[in-house]
Amino acid sequence: MKVNSDWNRERKVKFTIQDPCQIVRKGYGDAVAEDLRYVVKQVVGEENVIEMTPNKSNNYCCGGGGGFLQSGFQEERRAYGKFKFDQIIETGADYCITGCHNCHAQVHDIGHHYGGNYNTVHLWTLICLSLGILGPNEREYLGDDLKDVDVFHPETALF
């Protein structure tokens, strides 16, 4: 199976990318950020990717890592996350792609808390979408603009 962005050719849904601190900023650097972008562009279409500024190794932390999500300091976490929220909103993207669970939870939370108009989606959800398969639990991360994408639904297939 090969990924492709045909599902988004006419939709032109726009995506931005959250670079996880543990993997990019404090880990493997821009090389892995470039790998992430290569995959994302294959999956959603290069013309549908809007970069945050700054990005890659210089991207802002979302504020959800290092156990901060579970620390009990919700107000402080959200206040710190406002920088990331503003950065995402500035792109005008419909979705923020996250490759890290902590980032996903934080970006999703600050979006709802501050009234953002973007959805948060895991990278693997988009990979499944581009392959034409999507598990039942993955559809909950899609906004209304992607709920009707024609994909194979394994839970309803007849064997």
Specify the residue positions occupied by each region the protein language model found.
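Iron-sulfur cluster-binding electron-transfer modules in prokaryotic oxidoreductases
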Residues: M1-F159
